[in-house]
């Protein structure tokens, strides 16, 4: 996922990252978890318009589907995503 945080809220990226650590990392079925800030680059090909990225890996599609419905994921959306983000893009792939 790629997140564009609220520019009117200076701590929004930190709050989003903390929320991902708190709510998403412990969800069963997540085999790999990485959340972090955008890294500045001198290369024109690198998108530098976002503030935070999240990469999660699952062993199979069923675990990913279960993750979407997990109460901690729903809590993350309500308590960390909605208060801090203006936009997000999701890329699901094998």
Give each language-model segment a name.
Residues 61-89:
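C-terminal structural segments of small proteins and small subunits
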């Amino acid at each position: 996922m790629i997140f564009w945080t609220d520019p009117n809220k200076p701590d929004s990226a930190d709050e989003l990252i903390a929320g991902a650590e708190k709510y998403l990392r412990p969800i069963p079925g997540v085999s790999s978890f990485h959340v972090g800030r955008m890294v500045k680059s001198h290369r024109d090909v690198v998108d530098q318009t976002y503030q935070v990225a999240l990469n999660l890996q699952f062993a199979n599609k069923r675990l990913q589907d279960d993750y979407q419905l997990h109460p901690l994921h729903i809590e993350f959306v309500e308590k960390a995503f909605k208060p801090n983000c203006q936009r997000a893009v999701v890329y699901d792939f094998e």
